[in-house]
Each structure stands twice: as C-alpha cells, then as structure tokens.
Amino acid sequence: MTKSYGENGLILAETPGCRGWVDECLSSQDENDLEKKEGELMKEDDEDSLNHHNGEENEEEDEGDEEEEDDEDDDEDDDQKPKRRGPKKKKMTKARVERFKVRRMKANARERNRMHGLNDALDSLRKVVPCYSKTQKLSKIETLRLAKNYIWALSEILRSGKSPDLVSFVQTLCKGLSQPTTNLVAGCLQLNPRTFLPEQSQDIQSHMQTASSSFPLQGYPYQSPGLPSPPYGTMDSSHVFHVKPHSYGAALEPFFDSSTVTECTSPSFDGPLSPPLSVNGNFTFKHEHSEYDKNYTFTMHYPAATISQGHGPLFSTGGPRCEIPIDTIMSYDGHSHHERVMSAQLNAIFHD
C-alpha cells in the first residue's frame, strides 16, 4: 500500500481514487482471464461432444452394416437349406459313428435273445397243454388261449372237488378257440368235435333221444328215419346196430338213454366214426365199416341167390329172424317201383 508524504514530512491521507483504479484494473484482467478460460473450456467441451457423437454414429453405422451382412448371410443360408428348429445337430465323427453301430448291434442282440426265450417258453407250454402235435404247431395266441382255458378248467376241478365229464371239460378247453384248434384238441382227446360244440350239442342230444326211442330192444318192424319201412318181417336192433365201443363212450353217455340202449349205437347207417387220423397235421374222421357189413351180406332181397350159393342163415344168434317162404317170393320184375327204390337204397347201404 503506497503512502503519500507531504512537504513537511507528514503522512497524507490515502487517496481513494488510485486504489479503486488499481482494483478495477485487476478485476478487469481477472475477468478477461476467466472469460478466456471459460471460452477454452467451452471449446473443449464442444469438441468432446462432437467427437463422442461422431463416434456413436460410427458405431451405429458399423452395427447396422454388421446386421445387414448377417441378414444377407441368413438369407443365403435360407435359400440353400431349410431352416431347422430345435437343438443343432452335432457333426458326425468317426468315433460317434462307431458308437452308434455298437449300440445298435447290442440292441439287436437283446431283441433276438428276447424272442428266442419267448419262443422256447411257448414251445414248452405247447407240450404241457392237452393239444400237442408234432406235425401241426399252434400259433402264439392260440397257445396262450388254450393254456388259459386249461388253467381255468383245472382250477374249477380243484374248487368243486369233482371230476367233470369229458364233454364239459373239452367244451371249457375249446372256449374262444378257432375251429382248427378245436379239431386238434378233439383229435388229441379222441372225440368228435361235433359232439361237444355248443351250437350242435342240443340238436345231437334231441336227435339221439328220438333215435333211441324208435329203436327198442324187442323185435320190431324194420324202420329207419331216412328209409321207407319194407314189409320184410322183423329184425333185432341189437344185431343191426351193434358197433364196437370206443374209449370215449363213457363221455357220450349223457346223449343216450341208458335204460333203452346199453351200447354205443348210431342213429343212421353211416357207421361209427373212427378216432381222428393226422395226415400232414390235419385230423380227419373216417367211417369204419361195421362187423355186420364186413362179415355178412344182406340177402333178403334175393333169396334164390342165397340158396344157390349155399350161404348159411343171416344171423347165428337167437331171436326173431327174417323168414320168408320161397313159394310166395315174386320175381324181381314183379316188384313195384316203390320196392325197387327201397331195395336199391338198402343195397347201397350194406354193400358200399
């Protein structure tokens, strides 16, 4: 701070004008400096903002270019291959191919062993069920059905404690089976399938009862359901209808009247059915010629031929016989048309 001295050496009072001028000069310089600095700062800020903005624009342009390139690549890929959804498939290498082959071979071996075991089990089951044939092999489903029926029949026997008759047992076995399997079961059990089929058993039973009632044991006029009754006298039904009983005759007793017929009889003249024969796996029933058909000839139509050949009587056992006087016999031309038709039918039955 400057002090002014006078001539006499006294300090004069400070003049306010100089100080104010100095302050003003200093303040004006400071303001100019500040303005310059602020201007420089403003310029720097403007430059930084411009640079940042330009950088963002450049980045956006670069990203846009990249997206366009990606879109173009995707379009090209879409044009070449269809777009696949889901996880991407891995590339097949040699190691993966080998692993796939080994895995497939193991799976095939497991399936083959499983089928072999199943076939062996079915073969052993076929030997247990009552329908075993070396020539004819049951299918898998038929084997299982027959085994189910067999188990059910055995369980019913154990539950009731009584042994059923053969016909009902076979009906239980053949329930739900096909006709070839039913025939095979009947053949193995020595039965005729027509005797135990549900739809035919009632008809057969009624037919048997009608036939047994029309054939009494005593002498009777010769009658047959399918042939006219010739006036040739009387014959004994025990001789005409005598057949060889089979091992399954006891199973067919419900179809016959035990009070009137003591042996297995047949209502028709076709002869008894023999046990089924297996020809290439197919069981068939054939008619057996009766003993009277094999050993005797029916000679009531032509007694003159019997006398000339010297044959003995028709039946050797006692009982009413067919005795016709020779004098009353007319020639063959003298018979009526009805008698000729009837004799032809009888001749065909006893001589075929």
From Swiss-Prot:
Q: Does the keyword Transcription apply?
A: yes
Entry's SMART domains?
Answer: HLH
Where do the bHLH domain residues begin and end? 102-154
* CDD domains linked to this entry: bHLH_TS_NeuroD1 (cd19719)
One of its GO biological process terms is: sensory organ development
Q: What is the effect of changing S274A?
A: Induces protein accumulation. Stimulates ectopic neurogenic activity. Does not alter subcellular localization
Tissues in which the protein is found: Expressed in differentiating neurons of both the central and peripheral nervous systems.
Single GO cellular component term: cytoplasm
Q: Motif Nuclear localization signal: which residue numbers?
A: 88-94
Q: Where in the cell is it found?
A: Cytoplasm; Nucleus
PTM summary: Phosphorylation on Ser-266 and Ser-274 reduces protein accumulation and inhibits ectopic neurogenic activity.
Q: Where is this region: Disordered?
A: 1-96
GO MF annotation terms: DNA-binding transcription factor activity, RNA polymerase II-specific; E-box binding; protein heterodimerization activity
In this UniProt entry, the residues modified to Phosphoserine are S258, S266, S274
Q: Cite the record's Acidic residues compositional bias ranges.
A: 57-79
Q: Which UniProt keywords apply?
A: Activator, Cytoplasm, Developmental protein, Differentiation, DNA-binding, Neurogenesis, Nucleus, Phosphoprotein, Transcription, Transcription regulation
Superkingdom of the source species: Eukaryota
Amino acid composition bias (Basic residues), ranges on this chain: 82-94
Q: How does it assemble?
A: Efficient DNA binding requires dimerization with another bHLH protein. Forms a heterodimer with the bHLH protein hes2, and weakly interacts with hey1/hrt1.
Function of the protein: Acts as a transcriptional activator. Plays a role as a differentiation factor during neurogenesis. Required for the conversion of cells within the neural plate and ventral ectoderm into differentiated neurons. Promotes the differentiation of late-born retinal amacrine cells, but not early-born retinal ganglion cells. Its function is inhibited at early stages of retinal cells differentiation.
Name of this protein = Neurogenic differentiation factor 1
Give the organism the record lists: Xenopus laevis (African clawed frog)
Ranked from the top, the taxonomy reads:
Eukaryota, Metazoa, Chordata, Craniata, Vertebrata
Q: Name the gene for this chain.
A: neurod1
